[in-house]
């Protein structure tokens, strides 16, 4: 199962439930991979990384109206910390859980059934 930039729209309880449902849907040895936005462990760190992301997006040439629209949409995000999400995967039964990539407020993590 592969997901990208979707699960952060769910409540924490819905995230936990979804991880359990994904685990149940996988065959033994199956893999769940999620590319996701996350909330940093502290508000200060999150603000710092979010500001760096905005700066980088501007450096890469994002149009200001597009960036403004993205920032407006982000107000409705319900991101959880990366640590919480990895723990919820463990609780659902996943093993060999790993964060394969992390940059600012984005990560790719995975686990095996």
Predicted regions and their residues:
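A short glycine-rich, Lys/Arg-flanked "PGG" loop and its adjoining helix->strand segment in the class I
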Residues: 16-28
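C-terminal alpha-helical "lid/dimerization" subdomain adjacent to the S-adenosyl-L-methionine
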Residues: 35-92
């Amino acid at each position: 199962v592969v997901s990208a930039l979707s699960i952060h729209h769910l409540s924490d309880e819905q995230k936990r439930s979804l991880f359990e449902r994904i685990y149940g849907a996988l065959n033994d040895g199956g893999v769940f991979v999620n590319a996701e936005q996350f909330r940093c462990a502290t508000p200060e760190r999150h603000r710092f990384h979010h500001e760096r992301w905005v700066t980088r997006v501007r450096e890469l040439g994002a149009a200001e109206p597009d960036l403004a629209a993205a920032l407006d949409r982000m107000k409705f995000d319900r991101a959880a910390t990366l640590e919480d999400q990895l723990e919820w995967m463990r609780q659902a039964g996943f093993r060999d859980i790993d964060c394969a990539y992390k940059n600012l407020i984005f990560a790719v993590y995975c686990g095996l059934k």
